[in-house]
Swiss-Prot record:
This is 5-hydroxyisourate hydrolase. Keywords: Hydrolase, Periplasm, Purine metabolism, Signal. It comes from the Bacteria. It catalyses: 5-hydroxyisourate + H2O = 5-hydroxy-2-oxo-4-ureido-2,5-dihydro-1H-imidazole-5-carboxylate + H(+). GO terms for cellular component: periplasmic space. The gene is hiuH. GO terms for biological process: purine nucleobase metabolic process. Catalyzes the hydrolysis of 5-hydroxyisourate (HIU) to 2-oxo-4-hydroxy-4-carboxy-5-ureidoimidazoline (OHCU). SMART domains: TR_THY (SM00095).
Amino acid sequence: MKRYILATAIASLVAAPAMALAAGSNILSVHILDQQTGKPAPGVEVVLEQKKDNGWTQLNTGHTDQDGRIKALWPEKAAAPGDYRVIFKTGQYFESKKLDTFFPEIPVEFHISKTNEHYHVPLLLSQYGYSTYRGS
């Protein structure tokens, strides 16, 4: 049992820097705060899409962690300048709390001009309103 615990501890120490590096080099992160509770919104699905000639193409999807964050939403492919959007699937979040919402999905469009910068999209959320901005 001691060997198992030691092996698990060593494995997590080895993996943690690699995961932090991956998140640190990723150009896109999101964060959701529930304004009604003042707490993070965990488990919310977020979809990343790129604008194309005839609509939108999905690039990636993820779920917010216990802190309401997705630290690395950009897919492994290289970033390119262009128009993108993240869609926060908030309907299921409120449904799980047995609350109604006016906004079951919140699409946030943004433009990437410099692929060597980090883009952070925070969402401040309530049942009947939201706000967002370019974070850091």
